[in-house]
Amino acid sequence: MKKWILIFAAIALQLSLSARTIYVTRHGQVGYPMKEIRETRLTELGVSQAQSLANYLVKDLKFKGNIYVSPFYRTIETASFTGKLLDQKLILEPGIQEVATYPVPTPPGMSFAKIESYFPGLTVPGKRFVDQWRLCNESHLERNKRVAKVLDIILAEDKGDILFVGHGASVVSLVQALNRKIVLREVRKIKGIAWNCALYIFELNDQDQVTGGKYTTSYMADRDITNNFRCPLIERPDDSRYMTRAQDKADRAKKAKAAQGKTSGKKTEKNETANTRKNEEK
């Protein structure tokens, strides 16, 4: 009995020492995922998601901290609704940008002048923002290291509440990095899928250790929860813009089979070349 009392007392002490809150979210819905290597705007639903998120953050959670945003149009547009409610500027942070994990053409990122033309008076360049901020292809491990490093730098520089607005991949890396700051076994990791505008909430003490938090999409209806053009929580046979779960599964299986075919084709070609050389030597 005493053991449980001590455990609960320790948890209560950690929670009471919560000094600030860190919020992490992904941009609102955009179109087909391959467009993510270019500058895409939010769809009508994406705008609605961003507005719902902003209202929840500012009106329900009373968020008043700084907003760090990946310098893509879709992330800035998502964060702009929260920024406007707070009447504050967004901080452009290339450290939480999205980078492809496979070889693709990497277009240059928008310059600050270009961003300012789209969002006049709403953004400021962060300390790490330069006009050549766009990164090239990187592995998952490289992304995790990059994002974790930037997170630690920002937490050291900014001691208030913070909202990060990133992408599916960079949000996952941010959440992993923050979960590693849990020191008590009694504090559970914050888990949840990075849907468009889903929200991860981390409570930190004055040593930047995570003492609690949660994941939520409560401010959006299930029908409005998306992974860009996919709508994973419910079937959408009535709307051709979205894949149903069955279509999604079939699409993934088709792509996996095609990728496997390319790999086996390369192996066959390699073996044929080797056999040809052997015959020539004979």
PLM regions and their residue ranges:
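Flexible, surface-exposed loop/gating regions in the mature catalytic domains
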Residues: 118-141, 168-169, 173-175
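Beta-strand elements within well-structured catalytic alpha/beta cores of enzymes
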Residues: 21-26, 68, 158-170, 174
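Hydrophobic h-region of N-terminal signal peptides that target proteins for export
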Residues: 9-17
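Positively charged n-region of N-terminal signal peptides that target proteins for export
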Residues: 1-4
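Active-site-proximal alpha-helix that buttresses catalytic centers in soluble enzyme cores
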Residues: 20-93, 136-144, 149, 252-254
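Glycine-rich phosphate-binding loop signature in dinucleotide/nucleotide-binding domains
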Residues: 60-63, 154-160
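Acidic, low-complexity terminal tails and accessory targeting/binding regions
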Residues: 98-112, 176-282
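Phosphate-coordination/substrate-recognition cap region in phosphate-metabolizing enzymes
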Residues: 55-128, 188, 192, 200
